[in-house]
Amino acid sequence: LAKGKDIKRVQKMVIDLQRTTDALTRKDIKNWRDAWQYAINVDSPSRQRLYDIYRDTEIDLHLSGCVEQRRGFVMARSFKIVDMKGDENEEAVHFFDQSWFKQLMRYALDSIYWGHSLIELGDLYTDGDGCICYSDVKLIPRKHVIPEYGRVITDLGQDWTTGIDYRQPPFSDWLIEAGRPDDLGLYLKAASQTIPKKNMLAFWDTFGEIFGMPMRIARTTSRDQKEIDRLDKMLREAG
């Protein structure tokens, strides 16, 4: 494992990332295709736009329900660690039957949908049972990771060649990759369906606001044509 000064370097790399707010703007199929094109650019790949679309994709009710159901089934399963003879090593299981490992599994499962994910292990400590554990497991912000070249950039839009090579020590001792470097995740396919679905719901909402209101009827006892014309104009302007 990394020495004390190396641990500080790893932690500093994460702290120095200049986080930005995700753009919650309306997306369409053209945005999806353009984002895909940016992500597969050979010279300067960038998944930033694609992740903005994925953020919209994951809130789809049906899709999120399917994802959570699958995650629940996997996380509910028990596991065991065996040696070469097939005998279970209960002591080894105790090291992994901890909250940090469950969080690691969640991030690994998410990588199936989001694509490549870079996971950071926290500091080592000893729990009440004398078991060595990691204090936390965190996900390196995906927009800052260029998995095709194994780099982490501190600022969005930064040239990947100036980023930190996380596949070399000491960073490789504390960072775990989930998914292939070129994996864009299943949300790439799902987005082509959730984007039109969300937009059509917005269109129907607008349609309902305009045409879903009951018909307005105005009655008057006046026979004055000016009064009738004024009432007619008022109804027309009301929509």
Which residues fall in each region the model found?
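Structured, contiguous alpha/beta core segments that scaffold functional sites
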Residues: 6, 11, 15-41, 45-48, ...
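Glycine- and charge-rich intrinsically disordered segments
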Residues: 1-2
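Active-site acidic/histidine clusters and adjacent loop/turn architecture
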Residues: 60, 68-72, 76-79
